[in-house]
Regions:
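Gram-negative outer-membrane beta-barrel transporters
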Residues: 27, 537, 662-682, 688-772, ...
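N-terminal periplasmic "start-of-domain" segments of outer-membrane beta-barrel proteins
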Residues: 32, 43, 48-92, 116-121
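Extracytoplasmic beta-strand/coil segments of soluble accessory domains associated
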Residues: 66, 73, 81, 98-143
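N-terminal periplasmic accessory domains that precede
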Residues: 97-100, 120-123, 135-138, 155-158, ...
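Short acidic/polar hinge/loop motifs at secondary-structure boundaries
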Residues: 143-172
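Short strand-turn segments of transmembrane beta-barrel domains in outer membranes
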Residues: 187-223, 233-245, 760
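Acidic/polar loop-and-plug regions of large Gram-negative outer-membrane beta-barrel proteins
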Residues: 249-251, 256, 260-262, 267-343, ...
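Structural signature of Gram-negative outer-membrane beta-barrels, strongest in the C-terminal barrel
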Residues: 431-433, 452-500, 509-672, 703-705, ...
Length: 844
């Protein structure tokens, strides 16, 4: 069941694509999207890409194609859209796909976990658990994954920005509800180069100081004939990463490419993506939070830096567990985020008889990987944890590392801080995250006496597999930012109650929640229609989308424990006396079908060629997926209530756009009402989530370009409240967790001849760590700085420092999000500390 459906999709689409050239013969009109791509590539090829993108940072005359039926300028549209070119992305210091989004107003991207698994929100829509539930990542207009918040498999994990990316278009607000399924909040479209003109780049990046990374990027493309062109590029890298974990945690790379054949009236394109990459997983770490709930003081612990410390260690790289089939599985912790993608896709556009235009896109991806990272479930004194595990009189010894086997006579002096952590190893195998998507549309333009009319009819189909195997274990570990060791516990009777640092198979302190497996499939079908009318200076547009989801499959957890000799040494150690195993005989079904009608209607009025007003009303939906499993969201027969399976988001927005020769300003007021059903496995007080939210605010995005000086800036004011909570009514009226009132960014730069210097400032005001609104997370400002020197027209060198001032910026608090603890101990995740790297680039 896992691959046959995807293969059937591949065959059907391949046959369709094979028929397209014959149908396209003798057509003679150019398509709007190809025109936009061509214009952009030509600009980038003349005088270098950086110079092309130096043009106005918020260019309201730029044509955009994302979540819109036709290519249209920002000034002429009624949608909120931002665009980042490749040079802007490089100068911002963005390391991953989610990092790029921090520079966009209205977007809150918590990318503190490394190059994947980011938490992403837009305009106050909640991040109740993890991922980006109400947004969609796209690659050339097609979803990377159907859902943005799949546990341990978020779309940014399967997308690696590199030299292939020409620009990123970000559409915020309800217009995306009509042009994409499961994206009522925003669409992030990563658009690749298509080889309009001959050329490319090669770049080398080398980390400095504690930043251990080496990376080679390249891309090249150009015409093959007058009507055929290509582009190919990718990267390879290795190193420990942003934190010194003591082993190679970054390794692998990516290769992407496409070939385009222009025909009369359109084009045919085939593309591919190959990704096999490993990145370290950065989860919360131990730290000190003292002071008051309203004004806490956040500091590193002795021997453990909040910014650069990690629980990963060269002394702990192997985990033994039982998988869903009951077989032994050995995991290499160095795999971290292991992401594998083998994808092919295609796009075609041409005219039919009667002035109708056909646009066809498909993507078929075989996705798989794993997620492995240490999570500090509890931090306390080593003596207290020894007693918690082994009872009164329990003693400690080193389980591995340079002191393996030695007794710890003075736990209060352990690692210079006297602390230890009960660590839960998040260990998830992702054998099948395959998806197949297809989007077919027909469009036509009409000239009427009152103005031009554009009409689009389309049909979207996708199949998303989600197959996961969770096998978490519990360990005891020293609190050291580098080279930490596992600990053993011996009870007062002299009996070892741990084994090589292993406290338990599974996570008994969390009720063994996280020994589970599931094999589910979600099929989306969505016919849609949109139209626009431009009478004079007005532009009216609207659309309808009818989404249907069909869910099938099964899921199973553990039921009780068994005595199993997991390590096959012939001895039953204490952890082997209570081993949780997935009970496949008690697997529960998933079997339901749900529908929802979505709409979006907008208007834009050009007061002058440089000033416009716009407004929009939308109702979108997010169809829930694996987050309903295990949380009580499904009935025993596999069905789900409509309000649980489908979460509706109603949005209203309006604003003004203004542009002059040197400046641009985009101001948008917004209002959103959101339903949310979810689960959070790391929360032991609010595991189930059933809430409604209301958020309102204002977005500001502007730019100033004057001579050698350029600046892009933005800010978002958000007033968000929980308006209903079926699980915890006491939270009604509170601010959602981690939602700041203000989020802001600014990117100034100045060119001194061949030298360009600049910075990116990313900031947030304070927010609450949890929905009860007890403990505050302080606001912070992160500063990234760069300097680039053009040696000649082809060669440049640059120096980049991310988080220049090594700021602590908390994005979540985990162990005690409600209040400062008496001992000041807690766990939290911060933005990465200072990383400095040098780059060399040569234009081919």
């Amino acid at each position: 069941m896992k691959t046959h459906s995807v293969r059937r999709h591949a065959l059907a689409v391949a046959v369709l694509l094979a028929l397209l050239p014959a149908a396209a013969i003798a057509q003679n009109d150019s398509n709007s999207q190809a025109t936009v791509a061509s214009a952009t590539d030509k600009a980038a090829s003349k005088g270098g890409q950086a110079k092309a993108e130096k043009a106005k940072a918020v260019n309201l005359s730029q044509m955009v194609v994302t979540a819109s039926p036709v290519a249209i300028s920002k000034m002429g549209s009624s949608i909120s859209v931002s665009t980042l070119g490749s040079s802007q992305i490089i100068d911002s210091g963005a390391q991953g796909a989610a990092d790029i989004l921090r520079d966009i107003p209205g977007i809150r991207a918590e990318s503190s976990g490394g190059d994947g698994n980011a938490n992403i929100s837009v305009r106050g829509l909640p991040v109740a658990s993890g991922g980006g539930k109400f947004v969609q990542f796209q690659l050339d207009g097609m979803p990377v994954l159907e859902f943005g918040d799949t546990a341990f498999a978020t779309p940014d994990t399967f997308l690696r920005p590199d030299f292939n990316i020409r620009r990123v278009e970000v559409v915020r607000g309800g217009s995306a509800s009509v042009f994409a399924s499961n994206a009522p909040g925003a669409v992030f479209n990563f658009i690749t180069k298509t080889g309009e003109h001959k050329g490319g780049d090669i770049g080398l990046t080398y980390g400095l100081g504690n930043y251990d990374t080496r990376r080679l990027d390249f891309d090249y493309g150009g015409p093959i004939t007058d009507t055929t062109r290509y582009h190919i590029g990718g990267f390879v890298h290795d190193g420990q990463g942003a934190k010194p974990v003591g082993y190679t945690a970054q390794s692998g790379g990516q290769l992407m490419g496409n070939i385009t054949h222009d025909i009369d009236g359109g084009f045919l394109r085939l593309n591919f993506q190959y990704l096999d990459d490993k990145e370290p997983v950065y989860l919360p770490v131990p730290l000190s939070i003292t002071g008051s709930n309203g004004s806490p003081s956040v500091n590193s612990l002795a021997g453990f830096s909040v910014q650069s410390g990690a629980l990963q260690s060269p002394y702990f790289q192997r985990d033994l567990a039982l998988n869903a089939a009951g077989n032994r599985i050995i995991t290499n912790l160095a795999d971290g985020y292991h992401s594998k993608v083998h994808a092919i896709g295609g796009e075609a556009e041409f005219k039919l008889n009667g002035d109708w235009k056909l646009h066809e896109q498909f993507r078929i991806a075989s996705n798989s990987g794993s997620f492995t990272g240490p999570y500090p479930a509890e931090v306390n004194t080593a003596a207290a944890l020894a007693q918690e595990i082994g009872g009164a009189g329990a003693t400690l010894s080193y389980a591995n590392g340079p002191n393996a086997g030695q007794a710890i006579s003075n736990p209060a002096a352990l690692s210079g801080n006297g602390l230890a952590t009960r660590m839960h190893l998040f260990n998830v195998t992702l054998p099948n995250m395959d998806n197949a998507t297809n989007n077919l549309s027909f469009s036509r333009s009409f000239d009427t006496a009152s103005g031009p009319v554009d009409l689009q009819l389309g049909y979207y189909h996708s199949l998303q597999h989600i197959v996961q195997d969770w096998h978490w274990n519990t360990y005891l570990q020293t609190v050291q930012g580098q080279n930490s060791s596992l600990l053993n516990v011996t009870n007062a009777a002299g009996q070892a109650v741990t084994y090589n640092g292993l406290v338990a198979y599974g996570t008994p302190y969390w009720g063994n929640c996280c020994v589970r497996s599931y094999d589910v499939q979600y099929t989306m079908d969505a016919p849609f229609v949109s139209a626009s009318w431009e009478p004079g200076n007005w532009r009216f547009d609207g659309g309808l989308r009818f989404d249907r989801i069909r869910a099938s499959g099964s899921y199973a957890g553990s039921s009780g424990t068994s005595v199993i000799d997991v390590n096959l040494d012939g001895v039953i150690q204490v952890p082997e006396q209570t081993v949780p195993v997935v009970n496949n005989n008690a697997a529960m079904p998933v079997n339901y079908s749900k529908t929802h009608l979505e709409y979006s209607f907008g208007a834009n009025y050009l007061l002058t060629t440089n000033l416009a007003l716009f407004g929009r009303a939308s109702s979108g939906a997010r169809f829930n997926s694996d987050r309903l499993l295990f949380g009580g969201g499904l009935n025993a027969n596999g069905n789900a209530p409509q309000g649980v399976a489908v979460n509706v988001v109603k949005q209203y927005e309006g604003g003004v756009k203004w542009s002059t020769k040197h400046t641009s300003l985009f101001v948008t007021a917004f209002l959103a009402n959101t339903q949310e059903q979810n689960q959070d496995v790391t929360s032991q007080t609010h595991f189930l989530i059933s809430r409604t939210y209301r958020s309102k605010g204002v977005e500001f995005e502007g730019s100033l370009d004057y001579g050698a000086f350029s600046m892009r800036a933005g800010a978002t004011y958000t007033h968000s409240r929980i308006t209903g909570d079926a699980i915890t009514p006491a939270d009604v009226g509170n601010s959602p967790q981690r939602q700041a009132t203000w989020v802001f960014q600014a990117s100034p730069s100045y060119r001194f001849g061949a030298l360009t210097v600049g910075a990116t400032l990313l900031g947030t005001t304070q927010s609450y760590a949890g929905n009860p609104n007890g403990l505050v997370m302080p606001g912070y400002t992160q500063v990234n700085a760069f300097g680039r020197y053009d040696i000649n027209d082809r060669m440049s060198i640059s120096l980049q420092a991310d988080n220049l001032f090594n700021t602590i910026g908390l994005t979540e608090i985990d162990q005690s999000p409600g209040a400062v603890q008496g001992n000041g101990l807690n766990t939290a995740r911060s933005i990465l500390g200072r990383t400095v790297y040098a780059s060399w680039n040569y234009r081919l």
